[in-house]
Amino acid sequence: MAKHSQHSSPPRKLFDTLNDLWQRAKSEAGLSAEGPEGTRRRNNLILYLLLVLSTLYLLNGYQTLRNEEIPYSEFLKAVAEGRVEQAVVTEQTISGTLKPEAEGESTRPFITVPLWNHELAAELEKKGVKYTVRYGSNWFSSLIFNWIVPIVLLTLFWTWMARRMTGGRGFLSIGKKTRIQADTAAKVTFGDVAGADEAKQELRETIEFLQNPTRIQSLGGRMPKGVLLVGPPGTGKTLLARAVAGEAGVPFFNISGSEFIELFVGVGAARVRDLFEQARQNAPCIIFIDELDAIGRSRGGPVVMGGHDEREQTLNQLLTEMDGFDPSVGVAVMAATNRPEILDKALLRSGRFDRQIVVDKPGLEDRVSILKLHTRKMKLAADVDLRVVAQRTPGFVGADLANAANEAAIIAVRANKAAIGMADFEAAIDRILAGPEKKSRLLNDAEKHRVAVHESGHALVAEIVPTGQPVHKVSIIPRGAAALGFTLQLPVEEKFLSTEQELKDQIAILLGGRTAEELVFGESSSGAQNDLEKASEIARTMVCSLGMSKVLGPLTYGRRQQLAYLSVEGAEERNFSEETARLIDNEVRKLIEEGLQRVREILTHHRVTLDRLAALLREKEVVSGEDVKAVIREAAS
């Protein structure tokens, strides 16, 4: 009876040895490490292998391309003429180098396909050619460089791309990219969200449904399937969603709408299915989709890529999942967008996103609360009044206020102050509104005088017209990309409507700078370009959208697609005739000309005040609103 060997076969031993060496190399290089560091190292290794193999492949191809292919007859002629320096003869090819044809030239590498010739060796010896004969073919190197190396390169490149797209978790996990917020992460609660009291009140009901879903079921109702947060950028929509999860104490699945769309077809739908499957397994929980418009755009647009639209497939899967899951399991779907106008109607119907909560720009009291929240860890000087700061930042959202507080801290540090003062907040607000000061942009005396007259015209008209907002500051220090000066007005109170008189006063204030230049210098300059654009826009809105034209009457003309929360206007649909267009142009021109005539009368009547204000502005470069009022009172007395 034959005995079986206790030793493994040589191939098996070789495999085990190579495997041990590979595992040891992985351990020493840190490739087995878990987490982002291990992923980064493995991705780098794949990238290095790609570079090395690509270099070898290119070098082999370069070596092949260097050899000039010549006919066999030309090779025989070169041998006969003694122009062959050396040769390598195989069964398939003859390669080598030809001697330089002239002094100073280099040798020429060549390759040719031979015919069977017994006299070739004798001829080479006769001419003194160094030659080598190699039996067998180079099939192995051809196999390596023509097949194996390209396949390995493509495989490594595909693997590297897949790992980058899936966060380093491998190709098979490409449809699973949902991130769940770790329980150890710092919890965000409503105490960390200032303002937005109405939104927080509605979201508290969502928290109650998550914590006690049977309460509404006992009355025969059901908890809302979806909550959509809409509002301008920076108002805290994502922060509110995190606060809901923190208050409810449930897992929080957070994914951006853009993460559903990848290079591969079907990935978006797979990620939607995986997202809802994870949510069911971790119920009660919250699914939060940020920037929903990335996948929720209305269907029916132009067909792309041969009739298949990955975004529409992802949206269809999302609609199916929101219809299919049971609301009694305690899964709340929340989403945020600042473009609700472009969302698909099927996504917004009842039974999917039942509630739409507007997170709008904060009012005065909310801005005070937000400033207190963002400055609670800052060292503030005694002269800082956050209510005054809030009054001077109308239209600022939470992100803008946080940026203003941080800019004030940076300015205070730059000045080596022990605490942040009111002047630092003023400088920070000016920087955000008008851009940083350009002290290197020096104006000559003539330009400085013209800018001072221009800004004085704005400020003077703003203080004289009946509904003008008070002037807070006038400056002729260049700021931002192109502004050579600015006049800052701040409202006394929050306003949500504008009357016809207020709009006409705004046009007059905008035309004040150009008219002041014409009055003092006899001509205007290019500095009034932006003023004219804004004045023309207000006048056209009055005529076409607000019905403030007696000739055209209370009608609207033209339909323009608008993104309300982004202040972006699309193409205008013209729904009026050429004759009406001429009437619109005439009415707009009439409003502008009436404004110009009105401003000329104001500035002519207050010419002394204009000159004094311009002189003060040239001297100080920055004049406060109190100084402007003092000059007006002094000139009037």
From Swiss-Prot:
Keyword Cell membrane tagged: yes
Keyword annotations of the record: ATP-binding, Cell inner membrane, Cell membrane, Hydrolase, Membrane, Metal-binding, Metalloprotease, Nucleotide-binding, Protease, Transmembrane, Transmembrane helix, Zinc
Active site annotation, chain numbering: E455
Stretches of the chain found on the membrane's Cytoplasmic side: 1-44, 163-637
Transmembrane segments: 45-65, 142-162
One function term, GO molecular function aspect: zinc ion binding
Broad EC category: hydrolase
Binding site for ATP: G231, P232, P233, G234, T235, G236, K237, T238
Periplasmic topological domain: 66-141
One annotated GO biological process: proteolysis
SMART domains the record matches: AAA
Location of the protein in the cell: Cell inner membrane
Residues noted as binding Zn(2+) in the record, renumbered to the chain: H454, H458, D531
Record text on cofactor binding: Binds 1 zinc ion per subunit.
Chief place where the protein resides: membrane
Entry-linked InterPro entries: AAA+_ATPase, AAA_lid_3, ATPase_AAA_core, ATPase_AAA_CS, FtsH, P-loop_NTPase, Pept_M41_FtsH_extracell, Peptidase_M41
EC number in record: 3.4.24.-
Gene3D superfamilies linked to this entry: 1.10.8.60, 3.30.720.210, P-loop containing nucleotide triphosphate hydrolases (3.40.50.300), Peptidase M41 (1.20.58.760)
Cellular component GO terms, alphabetical: plasma membrane
Topology in the lipid bilayer: Multi-pass membrane protein
Swiss-Prot/TrEMBL cofactor(s): Zn(2+)
Function, in words: Acts as a processive, ATP-dependent zinc metallopeptidase for both cytoplasmic and membrane proteins. Plays a role in the quality control of integral membrane proteins.
Family listed: In the central section; belongs to the AAA ATPase family. In the C-terminal section; belongs to the peptidase M41 family.
Protein name: ATP-dependent zinc metalloprotease FtsH
Organism: Methylococcus capsulatus (strain ATCC 33009 / NCIMB 11132 / Bath)
